[in-house]
């Protein structure tokens, strides 16, 4: 999250960004299981990735007030991620930041106190 804020500040305050679009991604491709393992390793507490079925997700969204069309659209987005169609790493973030992006493990280590 800090990377995104710093990138945004660089674009807003810097020159030469007018009319440009950037693909900002993280520095690594991680599954939910990968992310859970990172948090388990960093915190020493077991973290499990749980992927609820579509009906559970849909009902949860509808119960929290989402319109049906929007909830269905969110399920489509989740399917896109689950099928790895969005599994892309772009160099834009690192180029705009001028240094390597923070990995999830680095983020978890830097913010460990917030997670334990």
Describe the predicted segments one by one.
Residues 78-84:
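Short glycine/proline-rich, acidic loop/turn segments that cap or connect secondary-structure elements
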Residues 5-73, 85-116:
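Mid/C-terminal beta-alpha module of Rossmann-like enzyme folds, strongest
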Residues 1-3:
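A conserved structural motif in NAD(P)-dependent oxidoreductases
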